[in-house]
Amino acid sequence: MEGPDPARDPAEKIGQVRSNLRAWHPLDWLVFWIAVPALLFVVYALPQAFKDRYLVLDTQFPWRLQTWLLSSYTHSQFYPHLIGNVAFYLVVLGMIFAFEHDRRRFRVLAGWSFLAVPVLSSGLTIALWGAFGRNTTGQGFSAVIGAFLAYAMFLFVLWSVEDRMAVFDDPSLFPGSPARYHTLRILLGIALALIVVMGVISGTFTEEGGAVSNGIAHFGGFISGLALLLLMSLKKKGWSYFDTILGTSILVGILWYAYYLFILVRFVRSA
């Protein structure tokens, strides 16, 4: 027996975005859209000698523990590093404000991104460059943005299929043919896998403006944010098809990136 099509029409989906945007408290707009970028500009304006000693992460001095957190809010180059990070942060934040309706999830992800991700990315940076047998310095908001980017992409996919979520676990709810049903499941799997692919791509080490991007910090922020979203989803409703595919994609992404790092370490140490 065919059930009703659980999907909402496009106008209703757009209406949800408008409702989400209107629901944010003015303080949310003030803190995340104004205060956070302002903080980055204020830190940039500090004397460079002060930043180098107290804020910038230096793998030669891992005991400067404050740099594990503060380096993520530090920039020494106005353009393109600072401006690029602020612009990308605002774009990603706009996606989050448009697609998020769960304030508790937002608070948890924001807290994780702003406080835990900088420490995690610094630890990964120190460990990797120790494996290289070399030293480096690190700074910038990119790891935090990576976590927010994973969050935004997750929300977009969730917004796209949330009204059909039960269908993925119960074929009897789907009004179409079995072929259409399995095609829909495959498309969801591809969408979730592409999120992780984006994380792996962001984790590659590339030259940007005369400096090498800190790929492991980007990947650490991205994949940890995605893993936290998975854990929150599991705690709320247990395993589903959506969570199974997301969890599998995260695991494959971590293994894929670990192999990339293994090859990279061998190359650097032999150079």
Model-found features: residue ranges?
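A detector for small-residue-rich transmembrane helices and their helix-helix packing motifs
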Residues: E2-A271
